[in-house]
């Protein structure tokens, strides 16, 4: 918990100190820590840091960041998640759904409570989903949810991304790189606080070594879009 606050304070200090930072940082997106603990949905996030949502903790984030926390990604199926996201939505923070094993009902309840976005739609899910219904179909069909898509050439096949953009409409889609600190690094094995033992392949695929799970991206959108 202290680590998140210390990093938020560093961002806030940069915004106050450096003009370029002030112009470039519109807000902070906190992806977790209230996400699914299951392998697959949690992605590369360390299981030991996953915890239940807490308004008190959210308030400590905003205090450290001087109000810069603009978006939070949460798994809506967690105990207390709907009440939590309803409250932070009333405070002007964008609520996004992600790294989740949510049911169709969970997703609709979250939208009712004020959720506005699907984080990395099509990723941060179980490796195998029912044909239908499933969380992807439910989020595509939910008109109150916009979608962010990782278009690094690895997280989503081109055809899948095309269908998702057509379903949501270009005005409700945000393209992201999901680039991490290994972007542009030579192929090889690295160590990270997120994911642990990381492999960077020749095509800049960043994954947890020995698994199919991705651990961010090794490219920028300019490289692939």
Give, region by region, the residue ranges found by the protein language model.
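Active-site-adjacent C-terminal substructures of enzyme catalytic domains
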Residues: 106-225
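Conserved strand-turn element in the central/C-terminal portion of the radical SAM core barrel
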Residues: 1-2, 74, 147-152
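Histidine/acidic-residue-rich, glycine-tolerant segments that coordinate divalent metal ions
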Residues: 3-133
């Amino acid at each position: 918990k202290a680590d998140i606050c210390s990093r938020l304070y560093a961002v806030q200090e940069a915004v106050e100190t450096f003009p370029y930072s002030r112009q470039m940082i519109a807000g902070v997106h906190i992806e977790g820590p209230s996400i699914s603990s299951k392998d697959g949905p949690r992605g590369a996030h360390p299981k030991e840091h996953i915890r239940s949502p807490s308004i008190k903790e959210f308030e400590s984030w905003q205090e450290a960041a001087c109000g810069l926390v603009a978006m939070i990604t949460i798994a809506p199926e967690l105990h207390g998640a709907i009440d939590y996201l309803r409250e932070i939505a009333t405070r002007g923070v964008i609520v996004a759904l992600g790294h989740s094993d949510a049911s169709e009902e969970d997703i609709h309840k979250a939208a009712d409570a004020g959720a506005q976005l699907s984080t990395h739609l099509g990723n941060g899910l179980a490796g195998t989903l029912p044909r239908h219904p499933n969380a992807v179909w439910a989020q595509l069909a939910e008109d109150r949810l916009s979608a962010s898509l990782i278009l690094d050439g690895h997280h989503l096949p081109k055809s899948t991304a095309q269908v998702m953009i057509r379903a949501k409409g270009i005005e409700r889609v945000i393209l992201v790189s999901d680039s991490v600190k290994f972007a542009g690094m030579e192929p090889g094995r690295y160590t990270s606080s997120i994911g642990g033992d990381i492999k960077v392949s020749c095509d800049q695929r960043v994954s947890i070594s020995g698994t199919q799970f991705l651990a961010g991206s090794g490219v920028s959108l300019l490289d692939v879009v």
